[in-house]
Amino acid sequence: MKKFLTLLLAAFVAVSALSFTACGNKKDENKIYVGMECGYAPFNYTQTDSSNGAVKISNANGYANGYDVMIAKKIAEKLGKELVIVKYEFKGLIPAVQSGALDFIIAGMSPTAERKESIDFSDAYYQSQLVIVVKKGSKFASATNLDGFKGAKIAAQIGTFHNDALQAQAAAHGILAQTPMATFPILIGALKAGTIDGYVAEYPGAKADCTMNDTLTFVNLQNNTTGFTATDEDVQIAIGLKKGSEYLTSINAALAEISQSERDQMMQTATENAPKEG
C-alpha cells in the first residue's frame, strides 16, 4: 500500500506541473499561454515587481521580463489576446506545447532539426554566437579559441544545443565536457564554486551573466572559426508551436514588423535591466 501511495503521489505531482492549462476547456481563448524558464537572462528572467514592463508569472512568484517577454508582448498585441507567462523547466517546454498546456514557447530556444521533429517553429527572432563564460583571472580567460580550453572542465545546460555542441566537439580540443546542468543559475553557481572552469552560453546570455556577476567574464568565440561548429538554425532563436498550429502565419507576420534595429534595442534594454546578482 505504501508503495502504491508513493507512486500515486508521484503521478499527481507530474500531472500537476501541466494542470494549469493541460485541459483545453480550461484555457481562456482570449489569452495566449507562453512558456519560458524565467531564468535565462537576458532572454527571460525573474524580478520582484512589474517595473520596466514585466509580466506577472502565472504559476510562480515574481514577474517575468527580458527579450523573450518583449517579443511575447508584441505577439499577444498582434493577436489581440492577453499574455499569460507560464514558468517551466527548459526540458518540459516541448512536451507542454505538444500537450496543449502551452500555446507557444518563447524561451531562447533554437529550432534544431531534432526539435523540428516534435514541434513547429516560427521565423527566427534572434541569432547569436556560442561563447564560454569563465572566472575573471582564470587561466582560461585569455583563450582565443577552443584549443585554449585544453584541460578545462566545461559544462552546459541540459537539453540545449549548447550541450550538444560541447559534448560532440570537446574531445577534439582537449576539453573535459561535464555532465549538463539544469539551469544557468546552477551553472553560474558551479563556476563560482570552482566545480567547473566554464560553461557554454550564447553571447547575449553571457554578457548578461557577466553584468550580473562581476567576478565572471567570457571568451568571445566565433562560430565555425575560433569557436564551435554550428549551423544557422542551431544558433537562431525562434518561437515553438504545436505541429500544425493556426498561429504560425500570424506570428511570422508579427515578427516581420519588428525591425533589426528595434530588436537590437530590445536586447540592449533586456540586458541592462536584468537583475544584478553581485
Residue ranges and their predicted role:
Residues 73, 77, 82-148, 225-231:
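Acidic, polar ligand-binding/catalytic clefts
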Residues 19-22:
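C-terminal motif of bacterial Sec signal peptides marking the signal peptidase cleavage site
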Residues 161-181, 252-278:
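Ligand-binding clefts/hinges and TM-proximal coupling segments of bilobed small-molecule sensing domains
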